[in-house]
Amino acid sequence: MNKDAQMRATINQKLIETGERERLKELLRAKLIECGWKDQLKAHCKDVIKEKGLEHVTVDDLVAEITPKGRALVPDSVKKELLQRIRTFLAQHASL
């Protein structure tokens, strides 16, 4: 395992141990619902299913189709807030 992968694993473990990972996931979930992201993605899924027909779409197809759009639709403000929370966490646990 290279140094970056090892550092990521250590940080992830610390996020899990402290419960911060779950708090970050909840924050993200709430922010995405609040900004309408979830509704936009749901509508996009419906459009894809209508376009291709229910019988011709698998879950994997749907995921492959909507993932790029889903990532692109996450508002910068949400990304920045989450990144700031992660940076704050890392600063508080600098001994990693």
Curated annotation (Swiss-Prot):
Keywords: Activator, Chromatin regulator, mRNA transport, Nucleus, Protein transport, Transcription, Transcription regulation, Translocation, Transport
Record-level Gene Ontology MF annotations: transcription coactivator activity
Any single Pfam family the record assigns to this protein: EnY2
Cellular component terms (Gene Ontology): DUBm complex; mitochondrion; nuclear pore nuclear basket; nucleoplasm; SAGA complex; transcription export complex 2
Keyword set includes Transcription regulation: yes
Localization, UniProt: Nucleus, Nucleoplasm
InterPro entries: TF_ENY2, TF_EnY2_sf
Any one GO BP annotation for this protein: regulation of transcription by RNA polymerase II
Cystine pairs: none
Keyword Nucleus belongs to the record: yes
Gene3D superfamilies reported in the protein's UniProt record: 1.10.246.140
Function: Involved in mRNA export coupled transcription activation by association with both the TREX-2 and the SAGA complexes. The transcription regulatory histone acetylation (HAT) complex SAGA is a multiprotein complex that activates transcription by remodeling chromatin and mediating histone acetylation and deubiquitination. Within the SAGA complex, participates in a subcomplex that specifically deubiquitinates histones. The SAGA complex is recruited to specific gene promoters by activators, where it is required for transcription.
Oligomer status and interactors: Component of the nuclear pore complex (NPC)-associated TREX-2 complex (transcription and export complex 2). Component of the SAGA transcription coactivator-HAT complex. Within the SAGA complex, participates in a subcomplex of SAGA called the DUB module (deubiquitination module).
Family stated for the protein in its record: Belongs to the ENY2 family.
Record-given protein name: Transcription and mRNA export factor ENY2
Biological classification of the source: Eukaryota, Metazoa, Chordata, Craniata, Vertebrata
Designated gene of the protein: ENY2
